[in-house]
Regions:
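Flexible coil/loop and intrinsically disordered segments
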Residues: 1-299
């Protein structure tokens, strides 16, 4: 089974040997079929020159920090059906278009998110690594992700916590009577769209729990879907501990893209590392960091 971002697929597509949509749909080996069709009008030497010329150009770009990250971002962006840019200028022009994402006026990027937001967050990760060369964004790890999601960095729970989960959240402030109080508040708001359990948690946890849901880009990060699911019902500090554990285990369990890791480790410029929550100041610093990294990358 071939994939759009496999190495041989990228090489052959870049060499101009891209199968037609019909061939891609109907053929088991569409690129082999394409080459066989090309051999009807071209010599083997000509086909071979097309392939090795593309290979050496890609090899040159692999060793170029800017082109490695720019070309990789284009290959792995959403809705990338064919690689059109062939020259350095065309590739960098395409990157500039990826950087044109504008946060939603209603600050509801999460509910409205699509390929533009995904591509922008991917670009922010790529630019983050480029700025820290020889640190590379691992497109190899990226390709192993079966499905992507957008994670709330700091989220209201919106779910029914059991006694074990509430104890994990409250620590020494937990007791059976406190759990009963939470259950009462939760049940009163259940089915009425009132989220009274969330309001109760906000009062109990203070700054560690958001008073309102924030769907703006300053509260969103790119994460594999399975990794996102594993963070279910965790506060910010719980997510931070989980991501730190993944890193210590060399990402064998789950993988977080570098900029996402930096968010939860609070290692980006301007983030308050000692605060166990995601503040408004952190969101602003995160947005500025993304904007500066991407701005430097496309400049």
């Amino acid at each position: 089974i071939w994939r759009q971002d496999d190495r041989m697929t990228v090489l052959l597509r870049y060499a101009g040997l891209t199968p037609t949509p019909e061939e891609q749909k109907d053929e088991v080996f569409p690129f082999l079929t394409k080459i066989l069709n090309e051999l009807k009008t071209k010599s083997r030497i000509t086909i071979w020159k097309m392939i090795y010329s593309a290979f050496y150009r890609l090899l040159e770009w692999y060793n170029d920090p800017l082109m490695y990250h720019a070309f990789g971002a284009i290959v792995h962006q959403r809705n990338n059906k064919e690689i059109k840019p062939k020259t350095r200028k065309e590739i960098l022009d395409t990157i500039e278009k990826m950087a044109e994402y504008k946060p939603k006026d209603d600050k509801n990027d999460y509910s409205n998110w699509g390929e533009d937001l995904f591509n922008y967050l991917l670009l922010s990760n790529v630019a983050f690594c480029w700025k820290r060369w020889p640190y590379r964004y691992s497109f190899e790890m990226h390709r192993q992700v079966e499905a992507w999601s957008i994670e709330h960095i700091f989220a209201r729970n919106q779910k029914n916590l059991d006694d074990k989960e509430l104890k994990e959240w409250l620590g020494n402030d937990y007791s059976k009577s406190v759990f009963d109080e939470y259950r009462k508040e939760y049940n009163e708001g259940k089915g009425k769209g009132k989220g009274k359990g969330d309001d109760w948690l906000a009062k109990k946890l203070g700054s560690r729990y958001p008073t309102t849901e924030d769907n703006s880009i300053g509260n969103l990060a790119l994460l594999p879907k399975d990794a996102n699911s594993s963070l279910n019902n965790k506060l910010f500090e719980g997510k931070r501990e989980a991501v730190s554990e993944w890193a210590r285990n060399s990402w064998t369990e789950y993988w977080a893209p570098p900029a996402t890791e930096a968010v939860f480790m609070k290692s980006l410029p301007g983030l308050k590392m000692t605060d166990p929550y995601w503040s408004e100041e952190d969101k602003k610093a995160y947005r500025n960091s993304m904007s500066k990294d991407i701005g430097s990358f496309i400049d």
